[in-house]
């Protein structure tokens, strides 16, 4: 058995079957020769694998989600005296019986879910790394660039788009005393979105923010004239970029996110 060959057959990459076989074989004091046969889509390939397995006195372990392919392999392998073990089929059948739901029978579902998960994590990490203008290099790497003055929901919107839409978002705060990074004028205007808010709304938000920090709401940060100065600066920058501006004064994060997603989909950017 030390030199026993095991053919791992799958209609996808075969990682699931490979891991299960290795886990099972790990319980024995020998290391078999595991050979993966991925992306099997036709009975011709199965017939060939059965023939090779027979000549090598090998075991076949498989994850095939389509019933006809599973049945073909089991039947033909039995005819040739080849042991074939169905790793996932019995479990799919049992779940169908218990739930009364019909399986999708789609190969590679787990891998697609994994890819989506890691894409989300990557987007979240990107949003954190390039939050609040920390690194201007992120502007040119981003799927979306948000610009606006303080307290216009840039950070929560960036996180929402990362979590729910898997978009890499950089956000840049605009302050009259600081020139915007040059990268902001180099990025495609279709990727850039300005977040606008009314002076009165922002005045209220900033006063509440100061109160929550135990500070006086009479600080310059919440002064209406200062706010208007910042908004004028914002208007000047977005006019130069010529990007889309969204009024977030009375919008929930989800609403603003949907506007952005619809805009980029209409432009077929992704």
Swiss-Prot record:
This is Putative pyruvate, phosphate dikinase regulatory protein. PANTHER family: PYRUVATE, PHOSPHATE DIKINASE REGULATORY PROTEIN 1, CHLOROPLASTIC (PTHR31756:SF3). Its EC number is 2.7.11.32, 2.7.4.27. It comes from the Bacteria. ADP binds at residues 148-155. The keyword DNA-binding does not apply. Belongs to the pyruvate, phosphate/water dikinase regulatory protein family. PDRP subfamily. Bifunctional serine/threonine kinase and phosphorylase involved in the regulation of the pyruvate, phosphate dikinase (PPDK) by catalyzing its phosphorylation/dephosphorylation. GO terms for molecular function: ADP binding; ATP binding; phosphotransferase activity, phosphate group as acceptor; protein serine/threonine kinase activity. It comes from Bacillus cereus (strain 03BB102). It catalyses: N(tele)-phospho-L-histidyl/L-threonyl-[pyruvate, phosphate dikinase] + ADP = N(tele)-phospho-L-histidyl/O-phospho-L-threonyl-[pyruvate, phosphate dikinase] + AMP + H(+); N(tele)-phospho-L-histidyl/O-phospho-L-threonyl-[pyruvate, phosphate dikinase] + phosphate + H(+) = N(tele)-phospho-L-histidyl/L-threonyl-[pyruvate, phosphate dikinase] + diphosphate. Pfam families: Kinase-PPPase. HAMAP family: PDRP. Keywords: Kinase, Nucleotide-binding, Serine/threonine-protein kinase, Transferase.
């Amino acid at each position: 058995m030390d030199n026993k060959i095991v053919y791992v057959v799958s209609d996808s990459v075969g990682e699931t079957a490979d891991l299960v076989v290795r886990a099972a074989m790990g319980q024995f004091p020998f290391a078999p020769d595991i050979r993966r046969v991925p992306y099997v889509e036709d009975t011709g390939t199965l017939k060939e694998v059965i023939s090779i397995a027979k000549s090598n006195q090998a075991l076949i372990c498989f994850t095939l989600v389509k019933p006809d392919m599973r049945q073909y392999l089991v039947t033909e392998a039995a005819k040739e005296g080849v042991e074939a073990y169905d790793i996932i089929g019995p479990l799919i059948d049992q779940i169908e019986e218990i739930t009364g739901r019909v399986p999708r029978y789609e190969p590679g579902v787990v891998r697609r879910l994994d890819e989506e998960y890691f894409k989300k994590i990557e987007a979240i990490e990107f949003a954190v790394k390039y939050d609040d203008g920390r690194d201007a290099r992120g502007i040119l790497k981003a799927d979306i660039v948000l610009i606006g003055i303080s307290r216009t929901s840039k950070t929560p919107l960036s996180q929402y788009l990362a979590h729910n839409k898997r978009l890499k978002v950089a956000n840049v705060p605009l302050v009259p005393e600081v020139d915007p990074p040059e990268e902001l004028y180099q990025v495609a205007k279709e990727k850039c979105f300005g977040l606008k808010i009314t002076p009165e709304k922002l005045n209220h938000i900033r006063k509440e923010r100061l109160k929550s920090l135990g500070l006086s709401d009479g600080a310059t940060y919440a002064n209406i004239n200062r706010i208007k100065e910042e908004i004028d600066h914002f208007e000047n920058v977005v006019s130069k970029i010529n990007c889309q501006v969204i009024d977030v004064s009375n919008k929930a994060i989800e609403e603003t996110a949907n506007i952005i997603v619809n805009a980029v989909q209409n432009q077929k950017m992704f």
